[in-house]
Design a protein with these regions (language model features):
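Conserved small/polar residues in nucleotide/adenosyl-binding loops
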Residues: 151-156
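Duplex nucleic acid-engaging cores and interfaces of nucleic-acid transaction enzymes
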Residues: 2-146
Length: 157
């Protein structure tokens, strides 16, 4: 089945109903193009699977866990640094594009709320997962992008 804008909207609707308000308790990257995020919501544990392989790109909830590599990738370590123990505040898609935005909230040292965004671009061989700060500046990405630049979404087709 093709993963188009309508399917993206449906998946985002389901993720929104299941994960908003959930606390991030685990993050690991079983392969170079996959991220698994453990989310704890109302006594239920979910695993959010993000896969950006060119042939099998997707974002979904899963019960299957894969073995965790002994050494975590740089991107995985950055995700853990910024997203562990945060809460999912909102999940949405950009129009009818295959771009999913997951917003996380956390308190900083001075008890102010900070927001981080995880952008999931589901575009075949151009798929990517990008971590942004509260000013939409790129912190890191799964596939190489220049960091410290302002994120701009892909142009609509």
């Amino acid at each position: 089945m093709a993963f188009d804008g309508l399917v993206t909207k449906s998946v985002v609707y389901e993720l929104n109903n299941s994960l908003v308000g959930g606390k991030i308790d685990k993050i690991f990257c079983p392969s170079s193009d996959e991220v698994l995020i453990g989310v704890y919501v109302s006594g239920i544990k979910y695993a959010l699977n993000i896969n950006i392989s060119s042939a099998n790109y997707r974002i979904n909830l899963t019960t299957n866990t894969k073995p965790n590599p002994l050494v975590a990738s740089n991107f995985c370590m950055v995700l853990r640094k910024y997203l562990l123990n945060t809460r999912i505040s909102r999940i949405y898609s950009l129009g009818l594009e295959r771009v999913v935005v997951i917003e996380f909230e956390d308190l900083d040292m001075s008890d102010n709320f900070t927001t981080k965004k995880l952008i999931v671009e589901l575009m075949g061989k151009h798929s990517n997962v990008i971590l942004l700060d509260d000013c939409d500046i790129i912190i890191n990405s799964l596939r190489h992008l220049y960091t410290c630049l302002l994120y701009t979404s892909p142009s609509p087709r």
